[in-house]
Design a protein with these regions (language model features):
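Helix-to-loop junction immediately C-terminal to a conserved catalytic motif
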Residues: 50
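ABC ATPase NBD Q-loop/coupling interface
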Residues: 59-77
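Conserved ABC ATPase "signature" region
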Residues: 113-138
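Conserved ABC ATPase signature
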Residues: 143-147, 151
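Catalytic Walker B motif of ABC-type/P-loop ATPase nucleotide-binding domains
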Residues: 168-171
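Helix N-cap at the start of a conserved alpha-helix in ABC-type nucleotide-binding domains
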Residues: 179-181
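H-loop/switch region of ABC-family ATPase nucleotide-binding domains
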Residues: 204-205
């Protein structure tokens, strides 16, 4: 099992319980979506999984290794196997597409203005190949600030792949995009996932897209996993279990 989340809890200083009992597992090669209403704990969960936030209890195992209780070196080693793409892209706007992709190779994503000169030709060629894979071969030297939202997310995907991740966290990857562009991004993500047998865990508010592109759904509500089911589970059952409402009738 690539990822195991076992009874994970997180409470903030204002005593808000963001996660009260989150437990699920993800197998190698799965495309799993985490769904739920706003405030369900999805973003907190993803921040814990990418290492930017510590949980208050429970355990997270990546390839059998306890992530939370590991020493600093082991945590860093685990984090290098996890790539993340974000709703807001998290790119360096004034840098080129190539520079942003190469940025993934730097410690803690620290940016070097002369980053392309910092790496050898092989790394630069790999970055360019990834930009080609996501459909941006003609944008290698283009500053990110000149790109559309969909193109920026393609750069972000290439950057995440530069880490050769075993697990890709997609945190609301199409929430800021129009429906057509969002679907194109998810189609690209699914193609890459299937080609590379990559494991994808996606946080999404869009049930329809989650069902279409995922193999499994994890439903969160009030910090607790209330659903773990195949993606083709009838929508009315998902709505009742996760959102506590019935499917709207025409």
């Amino acid at each position: 099992m690539l990822l195991k989340v076992q009874h994970v809890r997180k409470e903030f200083q204002n005593r808000t319980h963001a996660l009260t009992d989150a437990s699920f597992s993800v197998s190698q090669g799965d495309f799993v979506s985490v769904i739920g209403p706003s405030g369900a704990g999805k973003t907190t969960l993803f921040r814990i999984l990418n290492g930017s936030l510590r949980c208050d209890g429970g355990a997270i195992l990546v390839n059998g290794v306890h992530f939370e209780s590991a020493d600093r070196r082991t945590r860093r080693a685990i984090q290098t196997t996890i790539g993340t793409i974000y709703q807001d892209f998290a790119l360096v706007e004034n840098a080129t597409c190539r520079q942003n992709v190469l940025n993934a190779c730097l410690p803690d994503m620290a940016f070097l203005p002369a980053v392309c000169g910092f790496f050898g030709k092989e790394r630069v060629a790999e970055a360019d190949a990834l930009l080609d894979r996501v459909g941006l071969a003609d944008k290698v030297h283009e500053p990110v600030k000149n790109l559309s939202g969909g193109q920026k997310q393609r750069v972000a995907i290439a950057r995440a792949l530069m880490r050769h991740p075993a697990l890709l966290l997609a945190d609301e990857p199409v929430a800021s995009l129009d429906p057509v562009t969002g679907r194109q991004i998810l189609e690209l993500l699914r193609d890459i996932q299937q080609d590379q047998k990559l494991t994808v865990l996606m946080n999404s508010h869009n049930l329809e897209l989650s069902q279409e592109f995922s193999s499994r759904l994890i439903g969160l509500n009030q910090g607790t996993v209330v659903l773990d089911a195949p993606a083709d589970t009838p929508a009315k059952e998902i709505l009742a279990a996760v959102y506590h409402r019935q499917e709207d009738q025409p």
